[in-house]
UniProtKB/Swiss-Prot annotation:
The keyword Oxidoreductase does not apply. The gene is gcna-1. Residues 308-398 form the SprT-like domain. Residues 1-10, 39-48, 94-107, 124-133, 236-251 have a biased composition (Basic and acidic residues). It is found in: Chromosome. This is Germ cell nuclear acidic-1 protein.
């Protein structure tokens, strides 16, 4: 008898599915027997033996067909080699979506750069990988770290960090159109150089008035002065001396210098809290420099010290220092002459304290030294002036740094104040030079009231203006003036002669007569016609 089907199947490598398929196809005509069932079924032994042999042979054939043996590996077809053509341009890709031939021709005419095959394809922007920041251990991790033995590791496993999902950005059609238009613009534009960064010029607003520097040979133009001022400010900001220098206005000198002359110069400062020099006590009083003798003696003393200690290279016959009361806003000025001499002028209106006189004189002597010693023309506050200023700071180290401009508040003797309550217009003058009968407030067209400054009480006293005259109210600009009277034209000739002369003038000029003769004849004829 042949080997049972299940034993053959167990010895082979066939799967369960192949077993079921072969069994169902071979014994489809037979019914399975159930030992537990109580129904009366036909027994297999009643079937003829011939049918059983046929079914077994069919089963064996099915098993061989169902790959009872080990399966063979799958066959892979070789990759096809595609003949690649030339790369498509952006215009060719766009033409594939357009059906009408007219629209294709129009696209080729409007955007020829899209069909240029020599152009490099757009490259995707490089993705920049951002480094992950490693955060410090949390509190509980630090606690575990403390309890770990010296050579051991904590048993607690670290939690794995969840990676963030990437955001998916869906771009609309309008964004795609905008990107396409920007791409076309980049194709058409020519490569340009990157813009150079603009140079910011520092502007200082804490200076009120600039000092004057005048030369007899040629006056400096305003544009050149502005350029020198800007360069000077940049030099001062970048200078290491200025960075290391402590602002003199914020500090108070308490120690007395060992040098007697430096002690005298330092005693003239308003914020000096140390012992004051005996010779400087006269000049630091509030009203001392109002007297001419004190101003002259202080200026002579300062000139002697500074020229001997710093500006010894300037000959005494080439330098002259005087007071000039006509300087109302400038603290001082240096006039350079063509013969090599220099004159320093000081303003008694601005230099009302000994400290202002000292600082202004040093400033102007630096200008004089650049002309007399260095022979530098139009130097201004350039490197030559800065060298002399640095020399002053090195000799007298306790003195403040020499400033380029002063910010002194100028005292005024007279004040012209608008009489209206809501208006705050105020004009300062050193003399009663404003005619209140002719001048009015430019803001509200009100009258001016004259006040005088009293130095004793530090108040303003109203006085009468000697130039004031009783006049009518000032008309505002809004009121229109009355039109002028019509002008009467007086003519030498009688009425109607103009028309008569125009009509008969050419009759006499054809005869070759002069203009005066023609007009005489016409006037004579016109009078005869009037008498008739």
């Amino acid at each position: 008898m042949p080997t049972p089907f299940r034993d053959l199947h167990n010895k082979s490598n066939a799967s369960a599915s192949s077993y079921e398929t072969a069994w169902s196809s071979s014994f489809s005509s037979r019914r399975s027997t159930n030992n537990d069932s109580k129904s009366n079924l036909k027994e297999i032994k009643d079937e003829p033996i011939s049918n059983l042999d046929e079914s077994i042979s069919i089963l064996e054939n099915n098993i061989s067909m169902m790959s009872v043996s080990s399966p063979t590996p799958a066959y892979r077809t070789p990759a096809r080699v595609i003949a690649r053509e030339a790369p498509m341009t952006p215009g060719d890709r766009l033409l594939q979506k357009i059906e009408k031939e007219d629209e294709r021709d129009m696209l080729r005419q409007l955007y020829p750069e899209m069909f240029d095959s020599n152009q490099k394809p757009r490259q995707k922007p490089k993705e920049v990988k951002k480094a992950l920041k490693v955060e410090s251990l949390s509190d509980y991790e630090n606690d575990d770290k403390e309890n770990v033995p010296p050579c051991g590791k904590p048993s607690k496993e670290k939690e794995e960090k969840k990676q963030r999902t990437k955001k998916i950005v869906i771009s609309s059609d309008s964004e795609d159109d905008g990107n396409f238009e920007n791409y076309l613009k980049t194709l058409r534009e020519k490569p340009t150089e990157p813009a150079k960064p603009e140079r910011k010029i520092p502007v200082k607003k804490d200076f009120v008035v600039d000092d004057d520097y005048i030369s007899e040979e040629s006056s400096e133009e305003e544009s050149e002065e502005e350029e020198e001022d800007v360069d000077d400010e940049e030099y001062r900001e970048s200078s290491p001396e200025v960075e290391a220098k402590i602002s003199y206005s914020d500090r108070k000198q308490k120690k007395r210098p060992t040098d007697e002359e430096e002690w005298f110069l330092l005693s003239l400062s308003e914020k000096f809290s140390g012992p004051i020099h005996e010779d400087a006590k006269v000049y630091i009083k509030e009203t001392s420099l109002r007297y001419k003798k004190h101003r002259e003696s202080l200026l002579t003393r300062l000139q002697d010290i500074l020229v001997r200690r710093i500006f010894s290279a300037i000959p005494s016959e080439k330098l002259k220092v005087i007071w000039n009361a006509r300087l109302r806003k400038s603290a001082g000025q240096c006039r350079n002459h063509s013969n090599g001499n220099s004159t320093v002028e000081m303003s008694p209106v601005v230099c009302t304290t000994a400290e202002r006189v000292r600082d202004t004189l040093i400033h102007e002597l630096c200008h004089a030294a650049t002309w007399v010693v260095d022979r530098l023309h139009k130097e201004g506050h350039g490197p030559g002036w800065k060298r002399w200023g640095a020399r002053c700071s090195s000799v007298f180290k306790s003195l403040p740094f020499i400033e380029r401009c002063h910010s002194y508040e100028i005292e005024a003797k007279f004040f012209y104040v608008c009489e209206k309550d809501g208006c705050d217009v105020e004009i300062k003058r050193q003399s009663k030079s404003l005619d209140t009968s002719r001048k009015a407030c430019g803001r509200c067209f009100g009258r001016f009231i004259l006040y005088r400054y009293c130095r004793r009480t530090n108040t303003r006293i109203r006085i009468e203006d000697p130039k004031a005259k009783p006049v009518g109210p000032i008309l505002s600009n809004s009121s229109k003036p009355s039109p002028p009277a019509p002008r009467r034209i007086v003519s030498e000739h009688p009425e109607g002669f103009k028309e008569y002369s125009e009509e008969h003038y050419w009759k006499y000029t054809a005869q070759g007569l002069k203009h005066s003769d023609v007009m005489g004849k016409l006037l004579k004829e016109f009078k005869e016609l009037k008498q008739l």
